[in-house]
Every structure is written in C-alpha cells, then in structure tokens.
Design a protein with these regions (language model features):
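Active-site rim/adjacent substrate-binding subdomains
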Residues: 1-140, 145-186
Length: 186
C-alpha cells in the first residue's frame, strides 16, 4: 500500500526513532509498504519517520539507478534498528541531495564517503560492515531521519538563510509534488 509522505514541519521528523522489538507486528508488510511508497514517489530511500512512524526502519532501493550504475542492480534492502557506528571522515564528498519530505528542495550536502554500519535485514539477520560510495550517502541521509534530522540541518548558516522562504512555504503546506503527502497542520 502506498502511504503518504510526512513533510517538513511534521513533529515525527524531529524525534529520535526507537529500536523496534524483533516481534514487531506486521514488519514485513510495513517494509513492503515502504518500498511501494518509495517507488511511487521516485525515491532511492525512505525512513519510517517519513511515513509517520518513529521507529528505526529504513529501506534503500538503488536498483532504479542500475542503468547508470550496474553495481546497484537488484539492490533493494531494509535496515532494521540500524546505527552508524563510525564515520571515516578522512574523505568527504559534497553532492546535491533532495528529500521526499522536503519536495522541490535540493542543496549540496557534505558527507563521509565511508561509514561503518550495524543493522538487521528483513529476515532479522544482523550485519555489520563498512559501506562506501553513493550507498554510504543514502544510508547517512536516511539514518539522519532516525536521529530527528533532515538534510537542511547540515547546511551552512548562509545556505539555510537562502532557503528560509522555501522552508516556510513547506511549513504552510505549499507543496507541489506528484506523490501523496501529509503536510503540517496550519
């Protein structure tokens, strides 16, 4: 089922998400709904807070990029109770990012090129590994949502000032996008 995306200004986007118990009800259905919502919204990743749930569940679907990046063919994974344990800040990269919760807004964000991540997959198998490249960027972006952050929090004060009017418009529910949203109440 395709769910609405909660947009900037929704309180759930500012909460630190909680780990879920291993017997979380309907977890597989939730993950499937998140993949369907992400696909319908043309995203590459989605965190549970973006659908109104303050829990540590993220999905990443890089298969949509496989024409350009063959290494991401069939890359569709869930990250349950995920945590970034280490950032290798020896190399960073600045790249334009957008977010389904901030439709129409794109800004350059600097992130570590390599991170060490721990998570459970959709079968509740534990993983711990170094991740790099674009996948590391997507995981950092989505895991920020689990910490109550959005990508605009990583901008310089000058850039934040430059986009103030766009953020205010989002807060007022002035949103143009092709997917269903749950905007903040005016």
């Amino acid at each position: 089922m395709v769910l609405p995306i909660y947009t900037y200004g929704q309180p759930v986007l500012r909460k630190v998400a909680k780990d879920i118990p291993l017997d979380y009800p309907d977890l597989k259905e939730l993950i499937q709904d998140m993949f369907e919502t992400n696909t319908a919204s043309d995203g590459v990743g989605l965190a549970a807070p973006q659908i109104g749930k303050s829990i540590r569940v993220v999905i990443v679907d890089l298969d949509v990029l496989s024409d350009t990046f063959p290494e991401y063919k069939d890359y569709r994974h869930a990250f349950i109770n995920g945590h970034i344990l280490e950032y290798d800040d020896s190399e960073t990269e600045t790249m334009e990012e957008g977010c389904l919760s901030l439709p129409g807004l794109h800004e350059n964000v600097t992130r570590a090129k390599r991170i060490y991540v721990k998570w459970l997959d959709e079968n509740l198998v534990e993983h711990e590994e170094w991740v790099d490249g674009y996948l590391a960027r997507v995981i950092q972006h989505e895991f920020d949502h689990l910490e109550g952050r959005v990508f605009t929090d990583r901008l310089t004060p000058f850039r934040k000032q430059m986009i103030t009017s766009k953020l205010k418009a989002l807060l007022q529910g002035k949103i143009r996008c092709h997917y269903r949203v749950e905007a903040p109440r005016k």
